[in-house]
Amino acid sequence: MAEHTATLITGDGVGPDLADAARRCVHAALDKTPGAGTISWVVCEAGLDVMETEGTPMPEATIQSVRETDATLKAPVTTPVGTGFRSVNVLLRQTLDLYACLRPCKSYPGVRSKYQDIDLVVVRENCEDLYAGVEFEKGLPETAELIETVNRLSTDKKVMTEAATTGVSIKPISVANSERIVRFAFEYARANGRKKVTYVHKANIMKFSDGLFKQVAERVSQDYPDIEGEERLIDNMCMQLVQKPELYDVIVLPNLYGDIVSDLCAGLAGGLGVAPGANIGDNGAVFEATHGSAPKYKGLNKVNPTALILSGVMMLRHLDERPAADALENAIAAVIAEGRNVTYDMKPHRDDPTAVGTREMADAIIAAI
């Protein structure tokens, strides 16, 4: 029997309610599965609440725990828009080099959706592309200098706008980061019985950045003759996903495209309330819901826990506790399909008086394992 350690980041807003629900469900799945291992939890804080007491949204003790434990389950945390502290998610990804964002998108009977046969996985590169954060604000001398330098060095393409009114973002795409994310996608496909990996780009326009990603993906795909590899342009990919999502299996993309497409695919499957996720690297694996912290519902025992519990399913599979993971996912699916012990957003009408709370839905899932 394996003995695992895991960090539980309780988050803020509705995070503590969801963290408790997911932790109890993961424990129950292990307890009820013969031969399954155990998990010892290290409870840590991150986000707005700890920022107010410690002056940082991500204490060093939390980062160290993520490094030292076998996996991390993270509840939602608040990210201020436009002002305030940096995103905790970005801090974790950059500090620990969690280079792969994994977003399974799967439809479950009972979840309102236009599609009933979604079962695909989005793999997003986490560390570079336009999200590298290398930006130059309009009106600054260094921005004008950058534009002047680009115009001087480029023989045929010029920045045609006024430097004083132009902001610039840099889009780095490297061989090393492209190779490891594409290889991650193919390895994931092989380990999980997936048959196809689609690598997505806009190389017809951005020939030296997306073109590089495409070249690397084509080369890496040759190392996996048992997995079909194919390419798509990002705009065509979006149309194809809306028209024929059943044709796709594992999709791997650079950072910006991956951010957009992962939410698109979550929408195909019913929304962020049923969308789990993970950020994985050589220094840690963080499993999390992809929705926000909903501060207005803090402490109200109201919000749907499905996404974070499904993230717990992903964590169990990462820990090689597959029978327990399957048992928990089957229990989630059964509760959703029955439609009785579900939160307000999963009822046919959001004001349905029979809707249950976060805690009660978790109780129903535990009973169904």
Predicted feature locations:
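Flexible, glycine/charged-enriched surface loops at secondary-structure junctions
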Residues: G35-S40, N192-H201, Y224-R232, E321-E329, ...
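N-terminal glycine-rich phosphate/adenylate-binding segment common to multiple enzyme folds
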Residues: V50-K157, G167-S169, L256
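Phosphate-binding loop/pocket of nucleotide- and phosphate-handling active sites
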Residues: T354-I369
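Short acidic loop-to-helix transition motifs that present clustered carboxylates
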Residues: R232-M239
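Buried hydrophobic positions in well-ordered alpha/beta secondary-structure cores of metabolic enzymes
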Residues: D12-G15, D70, V123, A185, ...
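N-terminal beta-loop-helix "entrance" segment that forms/cooperates
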Residues: P34-P59, L241
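Glycine-rich phosphate/diphosphate-binding loop of Rossmann-like nucleotide-binding domains
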Residues: T7-R24, A28-A29, T33, E145-R232
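Glycine-rich phosphate/nucleotide-binding loop
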Residues: L48-V50, Q240-N341
